[in-house]
Amino acid sequence: MLLRTCAVLLCTASIAELTLAEELTTATDPLPQGTFTTWDHSDQWKIKNALAAAPDFISEHATVVDWVDPGIAGKLDMGRVLRKGTNGWTCMPDIPGRPQHDPMCADEPMMEILMDIIGGRTPTVKKVGLSYMLLGEARQGQGAGPAKDPREVKEWFYIGPHIMVALPAESVSALDGINQDLKNGLPYTSLLNPKVNVPIWVIPVKRSGERIH
């Protein structure tokens, strides 16, 4: 009887492990057509998803920070620290409501910019800020604000794996004249947030739908 009970417990544990492993594969697999990223995942899933945004030599020692449940907060905001890091980089899982994975890993200057924007403050960029999005992202277009319902967005622009560079305020004129077309796959300039005049230089390293790793 004892052996049978142990066997059942081991079997149950194995099934649970397989279920978790199967779920974790969805952290980086392409989203099924017609679905959107959500906040409702396990911490392990979010960590795996977030760390996929940057090269291993950066992500393996990065801090991972979750978003606050948008259904509760009513807006995008930083939440719990899921894992503490040591190298000054911070990785975040998917932003909910996007038609493809879009985790990001940012260095300290870029995180200062992001925190200012989320907090409703005008960023004062004093250093070059850098971030990785190696799973790519989907954007609503130049100057478009976040949609309340992603199903109502008429056209998404899919950007392949890329890095983003934010320049100090006194140097942003260096981005003048650079491509602003999101469709041609070339590096382009955009605003990090349509309400804040902080231009960034987005540099794709793969085509949309392609992966680095």
Range-by-range predicted roles:
Residues 23-213:
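Primary mode marks residue(s) on the alpha4-beta5-alpha5 output face of response regulator receiver
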Residues 1-2:
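N-terminal secretory signal peptides that target proteins for export/translocation
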Residues 17-23:
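Signal peptide processing junction and immediate N-terminal pro/mature segment
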Residues 5-17:
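Bacterial N-terminal signal peptides
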